[in-house]
Amino acid sequence: MIKIYDTMTRSLRDFVPLTENTVNMYVCGPTVYNYIHIGNARSTVAFDTIRRYFEYRGYTVNYISNFTDVDDKIIKAANEVGISTKELSDKFITAFMEDTAQLGIKPATQNPRVINYMDEIIAFVSILIDKGFAYVSEGDVYFRVTKSNNYAKLANKTLEDLEIGASGRTDAETDRKEDPLDFALWKAAKEGEISWESPWGPGRPGWHIECSVMATEILGDTIDIHGGGADLEFPHHTNEIAQSEAKTGKTFANYWMHNGFVNVDNEKMSKSLGNFVTVHDMLKTVDGQVLRFFLATQQYRKPINFTEKAIHDAEVNLKYLKNTHSLPLTEEVSQAELQAYLDAFQAAMDDDFNTANGVTVLFDMAKWINSGNYDETVKDAFEKILQVFGIVFEEETLDEDIEKLIEERQAARANKDFATADRIRDELAAQGIKLLDTKEGVRWTRD
């Protein structure tokens, strides 16, 4: 059985879906005001890998990942370049889809955009007001945190902890709130900003309400898994829980999953620190599969340190797997030995999607394959495991002149003309083709 580390309970729990053999997942997507950086891509790759493993295990996955296209950062960025917020969002949504396609990310079941859910957001906020969980103040609408049952339980904080942190705050928005901890569900329009009509006057939604509405509209009041980066645990996911459960009276998500950060020199990669590298720029010099492999093969909850050496190691390891995949097939091999590798891989991945242990099994299997165990059944199993990591190798073919040289070398070896055989081998090596003579015949790989 798959076990998931649930942030809410701080424990490893058996995964039991609401509907048998179906997984409903909502993963917070990007705020589309710029290209995503490697840290953002970590979340995208981690949850794509988790989704792929569920599918490997036979589940149908409804995978929802949103685009936040209404936000302060988008408004600011659009104003700076003199275009509409929609034009800016459209540009970076397209860039996101193109960049993540190179990382082998499967298309989501749906990628909802906030701009398409405005009526539903207004209706959601209205219900919270009617139930006494929210109030209007000078055109803004705020959520009453003190009315929420066990607020901040996800972040393992108490109201007292938060109140200490909020003490002493003073600004115009705080003055409009009943309590400094209250958060905005709806923001009154400011001059020159995009806005929508509402019962409380023109304005736009707050960030937290957007995800609650899109998740529940598409997947229902309770979902199996809600995921995102560890930085979203508080306040974003905390506030999603508060407002969603206030509206429905039901548990919002049964499992909460959070991926670790990408660090540079052991410091979190972020735009605010200026130590980030965009995926868009990285893909100009690094193959998308290499970057994917670097991100996918670390246990998703642990931080990753981003270094040139780590990328180089991923490239070398991926090349070994590619060469293994291209080996010629052998005679039928031991199914018991194959099953042992499959069982070990499943045991690793069932343990909270431990890709670090899973990839160790993958390389053990590759070593076994290279020792002459590679029939159709093994190749199919090997490819399916690679696909969990988002890796698909195209079948490689050789040019006719290369094939002819290999045949000439085989003939020379048969005639014990080893000088000619060695000359052809060296000629092929100069072209990046490495030959390996085995009892099953000659194998080749590309350097």
UniProtKB/Swiss-Prot annotation:
The keyword RNA-binding does not apply. Zn(2+) binds at C28, C211, H236, E240. It catalyses: tRNA(Cys) + L-cysteine + ATP = L-cysteinyl-tRNA(Cys) + AMP + diphosphate. GO terms for molecular function: ATP binding; cysteine-tRNA ligase activity; zinc ion binding. It is found in: Cytoplasm. GO terms for cellular component: cytosol. GO terms for biological process: cysteinyl-tRNA aminoacylation. A motif ('HIGH' region) lies at residues 30-40. It comes from the Bacteria. Pfam families: CysS_C (PF23493), DALR_2 (PF09190), tRNA-synt_1e (PF01406). Keywords: Aminoacyl-tRNA synthetase, ATP-binding, Cytoplasm, Ligase, Metal-binding, Nucleotide-binding, Protein biosynthesis, Zinc. ATP binds at K271. Its cofactor is Zn(2+). Its EC number is 6.1.1.16. Binds 1 zinc ion per subunit. It is an enzyme of class 6 (ligase). A motif ('KMSKS' region) lies at residues 268-272. Monomer. PANTHER family: CYSTEINE--TRNA LIGASE, CYTOPLASMIC (PTHR10890:SF3), CYSTEINYL-TRNA SYNTHETASE (PTHR10890). Belongs to the class-I aminoacyl-tRNA synthetase family. This is Cysteine--tRNA ligase.
